Amino acid sequence: MKSLRRDLSSNPQASNVASKVFVRSTKSGKVQKIVRELYLRQDIPCSSKLCSLCPSIAPSDANGNIAPFVLSDRPAGTKAFPRGHYLVPDTNALLNGMDLFEHTGAFYDVIILQTVLEELRNQSLPLYNRLLSLIKTDEKRFYLFFNEFRLETHVRRGPEESINDRNDRAVRAVASWYEEHLGASAKKGKKEKSVPAIVVITDDKGSIKKAKAEKVTALSLSDYVSGLEDSEKLLDMISEAREARDSKGPIGQLFYPEYLSMSKMMTGLRAGNLHQGTFNVSPYNYLEASVKVPAFNRPLLILGRDNSNRAISGDMVVIEVLPQDQWKSPSTKIVDEEAVTRNDNPDSEETEAVVSQNERKALQEEVKKAHGKNAEGKPQPTARVVGMIKRGWRQYVGHVDAGSTGSQAASGRRQQTVFVLPMDKKVPKIRVRTRQAGDLIGQRILVTIDTWDRDSRYPTGHFIRSLGELETKGAETEALLLEYDVQYKPFPKSVLDCLPSEGHDWKVPVSKEDKGWNGRRDLRDLLICSIDPPGCQDIDDALHARKLPNGNFEVGVHIADVSHFVKPNNAMDLEASVRGTTVYLVDKRIDMLPHLLGTDLCSLKPYVERYAFSVLWEVTPNAEIVKSDFTKSVIRSREAFSYERAQLRIDDPSQTDELTESMRNLLKFSKILRQKRYDAGALNLASPEVRIEADSDEVGDPLTDVKTKAMLDTNSLVEEFMLLANITVASKVFDSFSQTALLRRHATPPPQNFEDLINQLSKKRGMELDVSSSGALASSLDRCVDPENPFFNTLVRILATRCMTSAEYFCAGAHAEPEFRHYGLASPIYTHFTSPIRRYADLLVHRQLASAIGYEGEDGHAVIEGVNTRGKLEDICRNINFRHRNAQFAGRASIEYYVGQALKARGEKMAAGGTDSGIDEEGYVMRVFENGVVVFVPRFGIEGVVRLEDFVLPGEAGSRSVSERRELAVHRTTHFDPEEYTLRVEEKGHSEKERGVDVELFQRVKVNVSSVKEEGRGAGKRRVRILITG
Amino acid sequence: MSNQRQASSASQTPHLSPAELSYLYTSLSLPKSPIRPDGRSPTQFRPLTAESNILPGTNGSARIGFADGTQAIVGVKAEVEKTVLSTDTLASGEGGESTAATSGHGSWVQMSIEIPGFRDDDALPVFLSEMMRESLVGAVVEGGDGGGDVMMAGGLKGRLVINKRWHWRLYIDVLLLSQPLSYPLPLLSLTTHLALLSTKLPKLKSQGEEDPFFDDDWEVAEYLYPRGSKLKATSGLASQYVRPPVTLLVVSVGENVIFDPSREEIAVADAVLAISVTRDTEAGNLKLLSIRTIDPPSRLTQPAVPNSENVNMLGATAPTEDIAVLNPATGEEEVPGVWRPRRGGVKRSVIANMIKTVLKKGGVGEEVLEGLEGVEVE
């Protein structure tokens, strides 16, 4: 039998077509073979400004312009490459040294290959995103070269060649092509310009060897960096991950069990034997974590290092429930990593066990507790981490643990290993190798985690940069912003280009014929005013009320028309959607929109005409809404009040002008609305908020700036109408966009969230909390009153708030309609509409509402504006929810820091006068642990842990230094009753009643608040110390 | 056309006169040295062109074209599927591990044949696909003899088992590109064979009873019919001893056994047999999988009338000219040169001869397999 095979070699087109074949496993378990055809081309430019060939062949856009070339014609040289050089990094170089590539001191003119970019995406999505943003910026001159599409640089995979080898070969092929190409172009140009060297950077030793054979210049990352100036600093920024693996060779003692393979995890997850969730470390005990999984309605506990198995707070982990005999109750003890692992040495790996003696002791005591008989301490299911889905590692702000640097710290440039203590207590210490240990002590630094190997007790990371001295304003503010992932860089030029060209001179067009008036109602004759906190510059909202001829009233809420200035999908819109919200710190505001818009053009400033988006209601004198109307408008605010001034004006009977009358009407309506809302079951929640008015003079006591928020009638006036506007808009938007409306919901908290609080209240006060509905909760909260303790009610409200879930933005299609409910406000539907200057969600809702009412925009064809696909909207929701939460945390942390600094300033002043006695205040016990309590100080809105040594026992001098007090801890014992929530602290061997201190939950205690410097290992850190004095 | 559609057999008879049929029959039945219309030897196949891996999106594919212009393309696709345990196995509890879960199930191989002019539920495609599928899933290698490859224990069915809960499902799509000029079975079978040879399955990364998880690199995908080691390939031995089965069409005319019959040859055959063979041991011995008889079209041809019985010819010929002679193959009395439709039935010795020709060392079966092996897969 003869058979002949068709011959393809004669086909001239064959070499232009290549294909990429791979296997794709889908979520549903399907396995597909995917074939992508590649049509190779020759018009992809090298993008070097030196090149004389490429400009003529590069593809042009519709206007005949070609993309500007990126790589400099005079690239920087180094000692080794005096004629200048272009860099071609391999994937492993980027994995190990992304921070270096982002560094502004070096690494310019880099050619990023498509091959490398794709490989990077498969290995690390965050790094991929960072690289993309690097490519987008112009300064660093990173060029993305589509080498796989270019005929000359496309590399076909050889038989039995691994993907890795093939990609390495592709990198080398590009380097030699560039060399040849630039050489040819220089020859053709006959210019005596010297051709820069093409340097491949790879950490693959095999590839370097092959490069040598192929006459391609290749260096390892560290070799290359060593040849640069300032190499010591730069060398610190290379990731430890690869190096550690290489150098160690035989792996030492393995402390942690290995993670399961992906397929094992998937099998387990599908079968329901394993569970997946986010690893969440307890703020009070770093050895205890919880993971909330969908299968159970209570989070699972994870106790101890063994069980956490290298998970770090924020990681997506796979866990396995432990057998019942290992179930434990959550700890009743405050455990600080710093305290327990004080004496660890970062260099010695050999002697350390994964669970140190001290830690084991701490755990043992918990187990004992768990076996106690009490009801609350009933053992809870525990679990252990068996696999890792996704690391949630980010960059961490911290400081070098001075105790870990060793004696010769200052002496030399020798590389040594130090511990970095992250600011976030939930993150373990990070082992960092550095050559600059001496310089870094006392600095706020940014580090990142690279790896956590099985044979290492702590994760290993590397140094990125220093933010400045500890406790300096600049460093601490930046630290805060970094820690909460707030985008604080100035707006790039592309964003500022989107602003109106008139700048501050922009005005509402005079002629009504102007296109700016299209679809706008003229409301300039209405008596509109705004009421805001004092000194507010970004005025989002203004109000009016007037009597109608039929005896009803017209009430209007006018919101800054930000969507007029921020057009969908331009650079400014994208930037705002990334920032998500404006972040308010004590002395700084990180704007979502550029200054010009936020504080001027959009801001509804008094006496000038502004574009607005108005919601108008006709209401009866009993505040029944007859109809509501939405329109884009032009308004002129008559006055901008602060809450106090508005209140004064309303209360002043001599003021009888129309504006004041209108405000009185508004106030009247707001009270009715408020009552209606409470009748419907809205909650009056409390959060420990204080306000800092930082503009008072330097001479006075800085603590006077710290004010608890006063609630005036005018506050709730504005609040009520904003709620009403939001609710009205929400239902309108939902009517028009049943799938894509952007709404806000507050899920009903599961009753078990309240179990602890209910238990505590009934034990300590005999009070009951009915959590069956928000209305029931509201009324039972109202009943939680202690006549002797006026703050008690607020305290309960704070604790109740913490039991609830947080409200979130969502897109209407994501939930069924009954799930839209806002629990706290007792409203069936809700959204955010009233603060578009500072929240991106409001801006989106503005666009949706504009489209819902058929507003056509200036040019008449902007009917559907903004996001109209659900997938994209859900992405945005995820982001703004995250940003919103972080902004709140950052704000609180900022206040906390400010209070600490104010206390410190006061302390220093007092110290000059002789004594540093702190300040005496009232505090309330929020939580009782076995070895301490958590106390809330309403005056400063702070809560702090009071440890054993910080109890001032009767007959003892209160003011002792920190180190003196620390000595006390060992001499003290406690009697802790977890059922009664009481703690008795006394001197060892002195159990007489009068020598000890008893504290119990909800108790009002006298405390002494001061800011103290930590000594010893934590030197340079400052904390607010609370002493219980009685 | 309608009667052609209904045909389940090789009955697409060319329109030949009884005289032509008789001439063909006579030359083909010449003892020991039949003369075929195209001059081939009895065991000679028509030349063909073959290539594999022509469809990049499939797991394996092949195209074969015969010189007469008939062409077929076969694509093989594989899909992961959960093994459903039958209720009675579940009821029987732990001990009764489903045989299907461990040794595979015939229904995991699906075959569809498309022939121009036929609906997919017409008799011919259904019959053909069932005939080919049967030998595919029926080819079971005895694991115990030690010669069989571990991976192919249990044959193709066994190869499709991933673990107790998961298996591969194989879709074999056969497309005949031209009108069926001759009975398409050999063409389709050869093409399917070639396609299966080139079929690869993604490499399994998970182990044991885990949910399957595969390597995303296609280069490391493994052949459905595993290759032997390189050493064997270079030493000239068959590089691969477990092969998908091949179904050969064999006809007998008189005492003669003729392979790869053309349409005209089938039209006069005494018997048409589809013989499936495979090789599953290292020694290289072929194994007979099945023999199926196919309704010979010669049954339906018009008979010729001997002169002696022809009224028109009465007295025109000498009565001695058409004396009935005993046909040694069929044992019937026939007048030489006068066509009589075959009535079926074939002698035991002829069938034995057929099988021997296929299976013997250096026989037709081996020749075919070697020829197909010559088509470079990859």
Residue ranges and their predicted role:
Chain B
Residues M1-E378:
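Polyanion-binding surfaces on beta-sheet-dominated domains and ring/shell assemblies
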